[in-house]
């Protein structure tokens, strides 16, 4: 048994720990979630009754969006559309963590209030321990020329519709996330289960091993991956992303 099959059998043992009637597969059409889709449909078919749920955020590459509709039992829609989020809250610009602090700093100043000390220190780079925003972000925000920046896009496009579905159906999600994708995710995902019961069986999967699984079993990879490494919502101003999306994509 090589490393690929050893990992897949270990993955099977992880799935055996859950009651599949209490979970659903959260399917984004990306490389990680599609690996889990392939796993339950082709490799460990004893789990193929798991419900597959996707979300059409209106922001996916067309190839990924078509994949979501093709492979999902249910496709959810956002609680707010991108244009609505842009109008009410602003647009993403830097990292999620930086956008979080910038959003609350800007919100307070727009309302004529003094931002909380933590937000001031994060923006000014005077926070004594831990994370502060980058020099580039700081200069832009303090210049007075910054547009409305927010971290809330993912919340309304993905998290809120998913949570509503989970509450209505009394289900927990199976997430295709890998802990070594970023330092933030490494902190968030350190075991198969999160504190709130989400199942994250790929938390310890390396990119090298994932690629080996795809190669050995000839798992379909969308053509868009020939040009980009990841297809999740882009970390660029959402107004730029929106301008790239044909209006016909909003008819789903």
What are these regions (language model features)?
Residues 203-252:
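Mid-to-C-terminal catalytic subdomains of enzymes
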Residues 1-216:
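ATP-dependent adenylation/nucleotidyltransferase module used to activate substrates
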């Amino acid at each position: 048994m090589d490393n690929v099959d050893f990992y897949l059998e270990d993955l099977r043992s992880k799935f055996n720990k859950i009651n599949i009637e209490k979970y659903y597969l959260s399917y984004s059409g990306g490389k990680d979630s599609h690996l889990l889709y392939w796993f339950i449909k082709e490799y460990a078919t004893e789990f193929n009754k798991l419900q597959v749920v996707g979300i059409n955020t209106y922001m996916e590459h067309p190839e990924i969006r078509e994949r979501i509709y093709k492979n999902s039992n249910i496709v959810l829609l956002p609680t707010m559309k991108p244009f609505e989020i842009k109008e009410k809250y602003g647009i993403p610009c830097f990292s999620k963590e930086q956008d979080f602090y910038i959003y609350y700093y800007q919100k307070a100043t727009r309302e004529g209030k003094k931002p909380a000390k933590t937000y001031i220190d994060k923006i000014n780079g005077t926070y004594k321990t831990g994370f502060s925003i980058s020099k580039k972000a700081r200069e832009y925000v303090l210049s007075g020329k910054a547009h409305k920046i927010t971290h809330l896009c993912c919340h309304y496009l993905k998290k809120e519709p998913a949570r509503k579905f989970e509450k209505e159906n009394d289900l927990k999600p199976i997430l295709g996330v890998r802990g070594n994708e970023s330092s933030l995710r490494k902190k968030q995902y350190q075991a198969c289960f999160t504190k709130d019961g989400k199942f994250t069986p790929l938390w310890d999967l390396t990119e090298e091993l994932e690629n080996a699984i795809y190669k050995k079993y000839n798992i379909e990879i969308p053509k868009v991956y020939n040009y980009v490494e990841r297809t999740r919502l882009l970390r660029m101003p959402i107004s730029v992303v929106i301008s790239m999306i044909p209006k016909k994509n909003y008819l789903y």
